């Protein structure tokens, strides 16, 4: 049976301001409104974790920032 370890990382809203705020107050969301630079920052974050063996479990977006939940198999 496989064993896993988990990690939670916190990323402040200033880092991903446009990603966090691309949904309006009435709930309308538009992925086209996210600047490409913000997408590249998110890709970089995910790729850095992946290179260390971490797999994304979930990313939770809020007004204060992003919580990213990771897991990786324990050898």
Give the ranges of each region predicted by the language model.
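Terminus-proximal functional modules
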Residues: 1-75
